[in-house]
Amino acid sequence: MEIMDSGEPFLQWDKNLSELSEAGENDILYSTHFTDLLDDLSQEALLGQLLSDPFLSGRGDAMDTEEELTRASPVPPHIQAEHSYSLCGDSRPQSPLSHLPGEPGSDAADSESDEWPMEQEDKGIKMEPLLCVPLPALTLTVTPAGSAPEPVIDSCDSAQSLSLPQVKEDSNSPQIKLEPHEVDQFLNLSPKGLECLQMPPTPPSSVGSDSEGSQSPVHPCAPASPTQTPAVLKVAPRAPSSLSSSPLLTAPHKLQGSGPLLLTEEEKRTLIAEGYPVPTKLPLSKAEEKALKKIRRKIKNKISAQESRRKKKEYVDALEKKVETCSNENHELRRKVENLECTNKSLLQQLHSLQAVVAGKVPRSCRVTGTQTSTCLMVVVLCFSLFLGSFYPGLSPCSSITKADLSREISIHDSYTTTVKSRSLLSIQEPGGLDEPHPIGLGGEYPEWDRQADVMAAWRFEQQHKEEEAELHKAEHRPLLLSTNETHAQKAILIDLHTHRSNETAKVIQLDRTVNETS
């Protein structure tokens, strides 16, 4: 804004700020001229107030001046903080007659006192909610013309800088030129201060661009091109910072005041692509300002989208590297598993071979052990039977044979002593004929001649063989002397019977021979 002395002592308000409102909001307009509100103040008084308290003096004078200025003016509405090309969170205007946000007296409670009237006949200010976000501490400089010193006030946490409007004084015609650092406080941030602000890693809708609620409706006087050709932006990767420091956007302080307007190539290209005229002079008209806001918003959205794509690409690259490392580890683990499987197979083969060898050896030993066990059992049983046989001769298998032998000897002695009986027996057998063999009589009288009984009794008679032979020789001589007139068959039978006791095989052969001879 400018306040110029043009011959008559009155103040003139710049129209750059007043044209920010919409045309259809005439119900909340202020028809009172800004100069009418300041009629009671002269140029000298206003100059004294500007050079006195707001930045150099104490807080009390500034409060008094503010009360005097705001006592006669109605309460204006607040302006929303974020517009198309604003990056500031504070919606209060920049004015030398109001408190700065960094001063102790300016806070959310004093927001009603930070008011400023505007010169407007048929236009008003759009009522929008206030975002109570205070600015960081500021560094303020006052630069008067001539040889006046330059007082500088540094706050404790100076992160942003604002240049105080320059005051030019002449002896004859004093001219006061008030040039805020930016068009309104919507554009008040310097590149140095913005370096401290880091752009959050969020989608493009939250990086310094206007929200949908704060966008002004598009007037038909600014037609858009039916074929939009979006410009391809190539921005080198950079550290997260505010979009206002981008070389694709014009600095906000260059959009204020009057004079030639220098836009960036990207802004010019976007304006031409959208079908808007390229502004070259300041101040901007309402249509030019709306078009500039629109294309600046689009450029910021493009920049934020590129930043988002860059971050996404970095994230995807990191994930790809991680996947590659994981795949390499997986391949190594697969190789190890294959080696372990091969080792396991070889060990299983060795185990099966060892089991086969052990299975081949175990049955042989078991067979040997079984044979030895059966042999031992048979030997034990035999010894036990012999032991019992020696103690109990009546239970031995040869006891019946012995008894039969004794009865045979008794019968033989009886037959030889009583020759008449034997003759009668022989005479009884004679009618049957001597031609037929008579084995039944032999078996009945001498049951001990059976082959099995003789075999079992042979080993019992070995010790008594000599005694029996002597007795047999005596018995043989007796029948020869007593019965000399007996038949040849009877003698042969008796001889064969006595010789059978000495030799078992000879008995059977001689018995058959005698039977054949009789036949």
Swiss-Prot record:
Bias (Acidic residues): 109-119
TM spans (from-to): 375-395
Post-translational modification, as annotated: Upon ER stress, translocated to the Golgi apparatus, where it is processed by regulated intramembrane proteolysis (RIP) to release the cytosol-facing N-terminal transcription factor domain. The cleavage is performed sequentially by site-1 and site-2 proteases (S1P/mbtps1 and S2P/mbtps2).
Positions of region (Disordered): 58-77, 85-121, 193-261
Any one Gene Ontology BP term: response to endoplasmic reticulum stress
Region (Leucine-zipper): 333-354
Domain annotation bZIP: ranges: 291-354
Cytoplasmic side stretches: 1-374
Keyword vocabulary terms for this entry: Activator, Developmental protein, DNA-binding, Endoplasmic reticulum, Glycoprotein, Membrane, Nucleus, Signal-anchor, Transcription, Transcription regulation, Transmembrane, Transmembrane helix, Unfolded protein response
Residue intervals annotated with topology Lumenal: 396-519
Region (Basic motif): 293-322
Record's bilayer topology term: Single-pass type II membrane protein
GO cellular component, one term: endoplasmic reticulum membrane
Compartment list: Endoplasmic reticulum membrane
Molecular function terms, GO-annotated: cAMP response element binding; DNA-binding transcription factor activity, RNA polymerase II-specific; transcription cis-regulatory region binding
Bias type Low complexity, positions: 205-217, 240-249
Superkingdom in the source lineage: Eukaryota
Motif S1P recognition: positions: 423-426
Residues modified by glycosylation: N485, N503, N516
Pfam families: bZIP_1
CDD domains linked to this entry: bZIP_CREB3
InterPro entries: bZIP, bZIP_sf
Subunit text: Binds DNA as a dimer.
Protein family according to the UniProt entry: Belongs to the bZIP family. ATF subfamily.
Function: Transcription factor involved in unfolded protein response (UPR). In the absence of endoplasmic reticulum (ER) stress, inserted into ER membranes, with N-terminal DNA-binding and transcription activation domains oriented toward the cytosolic face of the membrane. In response to ER stress, transported to the Golgi, where it is cleaved in a site-specific manner by resident proteases S1P/mbtps1 and S2P/mbtps2. The released N-terminal cytosolic domain is translocated to the nucleus to effect transcription of specific target genes. Plays a critical role in chondrogenesis.
Name of this chain's protein: Cyclic AMP-responsive element-binding protein 3-like protein 2
Organism, scientific name: Danio rerio (Zebrafish)
